[in-house]
Amino acid sequence: MLPGLRRLLQGPASACLLLTLLALPSVTPSCPMLCTCYSSPPTVSCQANNFSSVPLSLPPSTQRLFLQNNLIRSLRPGTFGPNLLTLWLFSNNLSTIHPGTFRHLQALEELDLGDNRHLRSLEPDTFQGLERLQSLHLYRCQLSSLPGNIFRGLVSLQYLYLQENSLLHLQDDLFADLANLSHLFLHGNRLRLLTEHVFRGLGSLDRLLLHGNRLQGVHRAAFHGLSRLTILYLFNNSLASLPGEALADLPALEFLRLNANPWACDCRARPLWAWFQRARVSSSDVTCATPPERQGRDLRALRDSDFQACPPPTPTRPGSRARGNSSSNHLYGVAEAGAPPADPSTLYRDLPAEDSRGRQGGDAPTEDDYWGGYGGEDQRGEQTCPGAACQAPADSRGPALSAGLRTPLLCLLPLALHHL
């Protein structure tokens, strides 16, 4: 052994050297070319690099992977490591997601596949195994339909973004496993009808956005079970009528938007008008389109005398629901020729005259309060690494020197200078 090295290993220097060796990090795969990597939490950002496929050399410890704004066309099984918590793939050219791609990502909490204009269909088991997934983004694709069991097993999901697709129909029980879902965004599609069990299972839903569709009918039981819903948007559709029974199933409703629909303020409007007389909600205008003598009036401001010429209402027991042999037009709030609308009065007789859902000791919340924490998809930008946990210099191309390694290196510096 060299004399200089023997002297270095004697005395206090040996402890300092041992501390240095213990602090050395284990060998890990390098950061993929053109990407930026951070060590805490393990993050790889490869956004906006014109990648046509996912990089092959991703560190297996990666927890957050940002691949947005590339040209990636397909995803295959085995591409992603099992430690992923966040995966952003929005604004690519995705057209195919092979079965099993996400099956082993059991820790994944957020998956963003939005703004992929070539993604026209999904396999039924695309999201199988994602039991911890909390946020799923499928907005602004070209999806025209969804398999009936596409969301099966997503028991932790809280946010589901399906807006601005080409969805024509939603199957009954499509969301049946999503007991924890609080936000469902379906606006900007081509939906024409809401069936009886389309939202069954969504007992925790707080916000439901259905504006900008082509809705012509809503089943009287479509919202049954949505006992926590506070925000409902149905504006900018093709609704001429809406069953009052449907809204009576929403005891927590606070904000309702029905504007920009061709409301028929004839006998068909009576159930909805009766609901407004008892409900305590913040609502948009409900402007009459027909008949001509009521055009431009607000449906909510009509009087009981406006419905005196209507046929006598049919008695309905509180809590009763129509069976399969009932008229489909009646169930969806569309009056048949010569058929009287159902009497809504018994549905509201037990509602309190005053709103008992206001906050104690303060003013009622405004709609802005409810949306204050929500940033639209267009506002997400191209954030490289969200959160303060992974701030690093812009030119960083690898993990920063750990604090545990700095101390022993500093203690070796004087020794090295002494033996030069």
From Swiss-Prot:
Glycosylation sites (chain numbering): N50, N93, N236
Domain of life where this protein originates: Eukaryota
Span list, region Important for interaction with MAG: 315-327
Chain positions of LRR repeats: 61-82, 83-104, 107-129, 132-153, 156-177, 180-201, 204-225, 228-249
Keyword terms of this UniProt record: Cell membrane, Cell projection, Disulfide bond, Glycoprotein, GPI-anchor, Leucine-rich repeat, Lipoprotein, Membrane, Receptor, Repeat, Signal
A GO CC term assigned to this protein in UniProt: cell surface
Disulfide feature: C31-C37, C35-C46, C265-C288, C267-C310
Domain LRRNT: 31-60
Task of the protein: Cell surface receptor that plays a functionally redundant role in the inhibition of neurite outgrowth mediated by MAG. Plays a functionally redundant role in postnatal brain development. Contributes to normal axon migration across the brain midline and normal formation of the corpus callosum. Does not seem to play a significant role in regulating axon regeneration in the adult central nervous system. Protects motoneurons against apoptosis; protection against apoptosis is probably mediated by MAG.
Family (UniProt): Belongs to the Nogo receptor family.
Name under which the protein is recorded: Reticulon-4 receptor-like 2
